[in-house]
């Protein structure tokens, strides 16, 4: 996937893309973890009796 505009530029673009991908992944995990902690500390909702 080299556009021929310079190998260094292509490498930087690929590295930047990987960094953004990792950042999004970690942000997603952090949001899920914070949501889990929020639900845990807030206490379980009272379940309706069957």
Curated annotation (Swiss-Prot):
Subcellular location: Membrane
Superkingdom of this protein's organism: Eukaryota
GO CC term (a single one): membrane
Primary localization class, coarse: membrane
Parts of the chain that traverse the membrane: 15-37
Membrane topology designation: Single-pass membrane protein
KW Transmembrane (keyword) present: yes
Entry keywords, A to Z: Membrane, Transmembrane, Transmembrane helix
Protein name per the record: Small integral membrane protein 46
The organism of origin for this protein: Homo sapiens
């Amino acid at each position: 996937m080299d556009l021929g505009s310079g190998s260094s530029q292509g490498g930087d673009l690929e590295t930047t893309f990987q960094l953004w991908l990792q950042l999004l992944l970690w942000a997603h995990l952090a949001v899920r973890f914070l949501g889990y902690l929020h639900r845990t500390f807030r206490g379980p909702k009272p379940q309706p009796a069957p």
